[in-house]
């Protein structure tokens, strides 16, 4: 957290020693999470800021639920929350790019269900919830739904991507360089439309009026949430993909 005259880093006990060493002399204060004397970030902001001031954060890094809770608490002191900009962009010159590692298919022989079958299951769940479509932002849910795996996150076989599922169209938003010709052909045969990773917000902003959009508020970042037109109805709940992937089919059970 950076204010006009203070800066602080909040971290847990795994990094207390490392953070203390690396922050020494930097002017950045270490706040040790889970200790009784440590204020939360929200408490710090409420103490340091005044009515009429604003807090900026990158809406791609906060869930819709987290942003809503923070905005509500800040509003008690008439402090605004602005999630529209990444304030670090342009300052962090050597910032790593979004990973472009190639993805690979989780074959049906191991997953026990095709992509098309999984999309049908999700759409059935959406109908029962009274929703027309679903935003997928949790990487594990996307990997399960589209039978894909990757190496974007160390020790986790997930793929940096977004997805949108509806009866009419299922879209995987992913960097093109991650796709081989074989997996591109496979996904298209399964009824999946491929789109550039960065196009997700523009796509959501053009959803038809009166669409009923299912959103898992804890797993969808606030930038995606804010891109949904005001004419749409938000259906909140736990993602259908999260429920479905927890129910193991016979092939998956045999694989344990």
Task: Locate the predicted segments by residue.
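A composition/biophysics-driven feature that prefers long, compositionally simple stretches
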Residues: 1-255
């Amino acid at each position: 957290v950076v204010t006009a005259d203070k800066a602080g880093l909040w971290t847990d006990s795994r990094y207390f020693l490392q953070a203390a060493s690396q922050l020494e002399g930097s002017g950045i204060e270490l706040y040790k999470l889970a200790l009784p004397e440590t204020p939360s970030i929200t408490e710090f902001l409420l103490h340091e800021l005044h009515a009429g001031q604003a807090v900026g954060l990158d809406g791609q890094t906060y869930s819709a639920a987290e942003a809503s809770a923070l905005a509500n608490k800040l509003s008690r002191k008439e402090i605004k929350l602005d999630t529209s900009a990444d304030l670090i962009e342009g300052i962090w010159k050597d910032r790593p790019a979004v990973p472009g590692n190639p993805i690979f298919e989780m074959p049906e022989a191991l997953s026990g269900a095709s992509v098309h079958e999984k999309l049908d299951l999700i759409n059935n769940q959406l109908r029962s919830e009274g929703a027309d479509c679903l935003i997928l932002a949790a990487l594990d849910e996307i990997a399960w739904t589209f039978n894909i795996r990757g190496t974007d996150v160390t020790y986790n076989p997930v793929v940096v991507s977004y997805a949108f599922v509806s009866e009419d169209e299922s879209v995987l938003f992913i960097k093109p360089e991650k796709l081989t010709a074989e997996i591109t052909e496979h996904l298209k045969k399964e009824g999946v439309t491929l789109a550039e990773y960065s196009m997700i917000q523009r796509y959501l902003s053009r959803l038809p009026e009166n669409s009923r959009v299912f959103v898992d508020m804890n797993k969808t970042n606030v930038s995606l949430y804010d891109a949904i037109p005001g004419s749409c109805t938000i259906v909140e709940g736990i993602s259908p993909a999260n429920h479905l992937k927890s129910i193991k089919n016979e092939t998956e059970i045999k694989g344990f």
